[in-house]
Amino acid sequence: MKMPVRSVQLPLPASVREIAAAIAFASLVVGCSSDPSRVVGPASLGDPSGGSTTGPAGASAGNPMNGAIFWVSSSSPARRTADSWRASRPADASQLDKIAAQPHVFWLGSWNREVRADVDAVMRTMSEGGALPVLVAYNIPQRDCGGLSGNTGTTPSAYRAWIAEFAAGIGSRRATVILEPDALAGIDCLTAADQSQRLALMSYAVETLRASGSVSVYLDGGNPGWRTAATMASRLARSGIALAQGFALNVSNFIGTSENVAYGSELSSLVGGKHFIIDTGRNGRGAAPDKQWCNPAGRALGPTPTARTNIALVDAFLWVKAPGISDGACGGASAVGEWMPEYALGLAQRAAY
């Protein structure tokens, strides 16, 4: 059963700090996928006008993130909560530091009305200290099949213009872009004509983002519990994977790293040996036994973000969805996109580190 979406429309603020806060607030509309095997996460993680970088990280040959360092927010929900707990709950604050100390990616979507300016602002901040910005483009028409994370106002022509502005915001700077989580794995709800149109839009996005030669693109690759590798390979082949660096797995999901590596390796063999990244933010204990996707109990933080995976085809482990952000108001939990400090604490406490 789908839950209603809270529509959030915000004007573009003047400063980088205000832009980040506005985008973070707008991220409340992003949450559970219409397919119960996945959850789509928050649009951003705090304020990119203040932070640090983490790294350096080594990587295997053919990895554009080789040697990259990644940006860490100084004002993420985890950082703010940890700091507020420092005196009264010192042990718990130390646990939340496990989340606060790690880099996260920045989501941009339909809430970005001036996407070129927003991308430029985020790029300028996230690249401070030589860090590699990692962004998510999340605005494909009929996103989430009109479900909780839908964007009914985006048309194909508007999307092309949006992607062109997104690419212009990056310019010639180096960046990694995760392209449209759910767009390919979740395409089945569309008509045949709309499916063809989506594949064409994905191809356009890859070509546009890659035009500068400085952007590495990873297309939606779903996860091991959703579509077969053969199905995803066919969709990737028709979506511009030949021009992309590779694909992204497990975005906002809980499936364990080893399962993703096995699935990704099979998928890679079907798409010309392309590399992939894995969202490991919440997969430390794998998926819940009942496959619950909405704030499942007993989960844990997974491997921390790094480009030093020691796995030839895996370019990076990244926390694409911020651990502790609600998947939805299931079982009395906070609304989708809201920060849940106690849930985040549990993820941290159960981590293997």
Predicted feature residues:
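Bacterial N-terminal signal peptides that target proteins for export
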Residues: 3-20
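Surface-exposed substrate-engagement region within the catalytic domains
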Residues: 72-99, 222-344
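C-terminal motif of bacterial Sec signal peptides marking the signal peptidase cleavage site
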Residues: 28-31
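Active-site cleft segment of glycoside hydrolase catalytic domains centered on the general acid/base Glu
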Residues: 149-174, 181-215, 229-231
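N-terminal carbohydrate-binding/catalytic regions of secreted carbohydrate-active enzymes
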Residues: 64-169, 322-326, 331-348
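Structural preference for beta-strand elements that scaffold enzyme active sites
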Residues: 105, 130-134, 174-178, 214-218, ...
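Ser/Thr/Gly/Pro-rich low-complexity, disordered linker/stalk segments of secreted
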Residues: 38-61
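Bacterial signal peptide processing site
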Residues: 33-36
